[in-house]
Amino acid sequence: MYILGINCAYHESSVALVKVIGNNWKLISFVEEERFNRKKRAKPALIDNCDVLPHQSLEWTLERAGINMEDIAHVATSMNPEKRQKQNTEHDHGYEIEANGFGTIEGEEKFYKSTKNIEKKFRGLGFIGQFHFLNHHDCHSASSYYVSGFTDAVS
């Protein structure tokens, strides 16, 4: 089974591919889009470009593994749009924020829609497996634990 991780909600767009056989998780590849487009951080972090996929990283990863989108069982992105929208709109920030930007109701709605569009874009590329929106910081832990070979760890 193949699991593809994608980070594209902000900057530093990247793709990671893991192959899972039983309890053995093997990292096949990890690559950041900036290695292909030669732009530091790959893209600007804007309120409405969360769904700009790292296409060159994705193509390179699939080619390197010798697989197609149909071979991937799960795609996970390191952004949970529901959690983020709730966290960023239900309290006073205590500082001035730009109108229609990050942290405003209007801006967070744009961010939410753009983030939710990531799955649609993957479906358009032929992905037929399960899509997951995960909590960002949990992804940091998972990315090191599951491929570590350890059966027990503190994160």
Question: Residue locations for each model-derived region?
Answer:
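Short acidic/glycine-rich loops and adjacent helix/strand connectors
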Residues: 1-155
